């Protein structure tokens, strides 16, 4: 039973890493750049949920929606201001800019929220599942795994069966050829950042 418990915990933690990796890989695969600020966007999403629940006393659903909106807007803003002017810049310039954006977000969070540690509230209050004798699975673990599976299926369907998804694949394969075929490269990259940042909030 201990093995199954560890296995489920590992899958749950791996699901979190998978969601984080989705945002990274989408941006890298399409924009061909490492967005080092992605982790900081995740941090901002966490602070938004914490503030909404602890200070504004909103429900978990409202807090999560607020985090998704804030992270999406933040991701698109970062892309427009910091990365778009560097489309044809050397990789080192993009790398330095990405690190700079990361430090900027970290220090802004430090300025706004302070450096004191906080306990993240249990916003969902999901019951534990007693699967068998000696084997209990937390509701959060089940929700994390289920949400990751649903998001991956939805994202795969979006990429393979929508016009924007086809544009993303085209830009990923050959940006110049995609532009010649009428694909708006800038808009496609902005949508990619929006999706990646929304995933960061989740």
State the predicted function of each range.
Residues 35, 59, 173-175:
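Short loop-to-helix capping motifs
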Residues 13, 135-202:
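Helix-loop-helix "hairpin" substructures at the membrane interface of multi-pass membrane proteins
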Residues 83-88, 122, 129, 167-180:
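Short amphipathic alpha-helical coupling elements at transmembrane boundaries
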Residues 3-54, 77-87, 93, 187:
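Single transmembrane alpha-helix segments in multi-pass membrane proteins
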Residues 24, 57-101, 108:
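Alpha-helical transmembrane segments within multi-pass membrane transporters and channels
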Residues 17-21, 41, 45-49, 63, ...:
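Alpha-helical transmembrane segments in multi-pass membrane proteins
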Residues 85-86, 91-161, 188:
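Transmembrane helix-bundle core of multi-pass membrane transporters
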Residues 24-30, 49, 74-80, 101, ...:
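Alpha-helical transmembrane segments of polytopic integral membrane proteins
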């Amino acid at each position: 039973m201990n093995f199954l418990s560890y296995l489920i915990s590992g899958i749950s933690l791996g699901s979190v890493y998978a969601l984080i990796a989705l945002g990274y890989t989408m941006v890298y695969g399409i924009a061909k750049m490492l967005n080092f600020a992605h982790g900081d966007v995740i941090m901002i999403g966490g602070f938004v949920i914490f503030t909404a629940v602890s200070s504004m006393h909103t429900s978990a659903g409202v807090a999560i929606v607020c985090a998704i909106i804030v992270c999406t807007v933040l991701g698109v803003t970062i892309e427009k201001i910091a990365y778009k002017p560097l489309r044809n810049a050397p990789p080192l310039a993009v790398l330095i800019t990405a690190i700079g954006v990361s430090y900027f977000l970290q220090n802004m969070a430090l300025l706004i929220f302070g450096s004191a540690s906080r306990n993240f509230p249990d916003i969902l209050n999901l019951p534990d599942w007693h699967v068998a004798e000696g084997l209990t699975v937390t509701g959060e673990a089940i929700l994390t795994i289920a949400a990751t599976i649903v998001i991956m299926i939805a994202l795969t369907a979006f990429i393979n069966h929508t016009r924007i998804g086809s544009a993303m694949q085209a830009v990923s394969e050959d940006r110049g050829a995609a532009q010649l075929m009428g694909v708006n490269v800038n808009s496609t990259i902005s949508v990619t950042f929006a999706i990646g940042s929304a995933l960061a909030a989740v």
